[in-house]
């Protein structure tokens, strides 16, 4: 029973880890266009997210390596990313949006690698666990796309 519970937790972690990525990534450009951002501004926003994830990945990797509470750190990073994600709803001003988006990715981006490390350290079957991430991503793309089609792009962040 212990192994089954451990597997379920790892599978659920990856499913829900990749759901937000699947919900947001395919539609973010269209959403930003719908709130009035130019193509250049859309490119800046999305590239700042990536740059933030890369830069802060170094910091969070060091913190992760030096902490005993690895799961708590990951949970705190999830929470912070979620808060910043909600804050993106509060603005349509480019500079404010790009700042909040970069802050969100400072927490969200590095979580993927840290979770990979946690799963491998636990001795889980990484490819099996990772496949649940692909399932979560795919499910979120379908659900979010359907929701956006029915309710408009401006509604995608409420998911």
Q: Residue spans of the language-model regions?
A:
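Residue-level signature of mid-helix packing/kink "hotspots" within the transmembrane helices
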Residues: 50-58, 137-138, 142
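Helix-to-loop junctions at the C-terminal end of transmembrane segments
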Residues: 55-69, 147-149
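Helix-loop boundary and gating motifs at the non-cytosolic
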Residues: 2-50
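Intracellular juxtamembrane helix-capping segments at the cytosolic ends
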Residues: 28, 106-123
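Glycine/proline-centered helix-kink
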Residues: 25-26, 134-146
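Hydrophobic core of transmembrane alpha-helices in multi-pass small-molecule transporters
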Residues: 15, 84-114
């Amino acid at each position: 029973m212990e192994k089954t519970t451990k597997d379920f937790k790892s599978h659920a972690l990856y499913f829900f880890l990749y759901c937000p990525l699947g919900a947001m990534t395919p539609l973010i450009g269209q959403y930003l266009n719908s709130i009035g951002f130019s193509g250049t501004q859309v490119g800046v926003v999305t590239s700042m997210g990536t740059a933030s994830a890369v830069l802060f990945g170094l910091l969070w990797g060091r913190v992760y390596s030096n902490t005993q509470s690895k799961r708590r750190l990951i949970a705190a990073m999830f929470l912070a990313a979620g808060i910043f994600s909600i804050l993106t709803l509060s603005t349509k001003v480019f500079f404010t949006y790009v700042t909040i988006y970069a802050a969100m990715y400072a927490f969200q981006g590095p979580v993927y690698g840290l979770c990979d490390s946690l799963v491998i350290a636990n001795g889980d079957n990484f490819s099996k666990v990772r496949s649940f991430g692909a399932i979560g991503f795919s499910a979120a793309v379908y659900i979010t796309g359907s929701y956006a089609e029915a309710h408009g792009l401006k509604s995608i962040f409420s998911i």
